[in-house]
């Protein structure tokens, strides 16, 4: 009888441990983003947050979209409820308010833009490997300079 009671006690303790871990994981992570380098106090900073290289490269959807009114030189927002993991951000300062990255006739961007980790691209967006950063459980911060 004591062995059965011990087994049920062990199972109950294991379930309680698993449940508390699941609750902690459900709490997720938050990401406090700061955008700096804005010269003009007009339009909005637009961005997208990706959780995979495929999505980042156009083979999937972003997990979050960001839009912050550009009313000062430094802007901040908090993205809550994220799963811990690896993420990357593409962003730009939408000066003309059309919600699109404006470009010249040759396809070169004419609005300021940036990637997470302040990564730079060569004739295109920064590579996932350069732009990706880790979001850990709890509070995280990341700063991007728009140029």
Sequence positions of predicted segments:
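Bacterial N-terminal signal peptides that target proteins for export
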Residues: 1-11
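Bacterial N-terminal signal peptides
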Residues: 10-19
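Sec/Tat signal peptide C-region and signal peptidase I cleavage site
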Residues: 19-26
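A short, amphipathic beta-strand motif
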Residues: 31-37, 47, 144
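A glycine-anchored, Pro-Gly-centered beta-turn/N-cap motif
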Residues: 73, 78, 82-86, 138
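A short tyrosine-centered beta-strand micro-motif
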Residues: 87-91
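Acidic, glycine-anchored loop motifs typical of Ca2+
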Residues: 95-103
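Extracellular beta-sheet/turn segments enriched in Thr/Pro/Gly and aliphatic residues
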Residues: 112-147
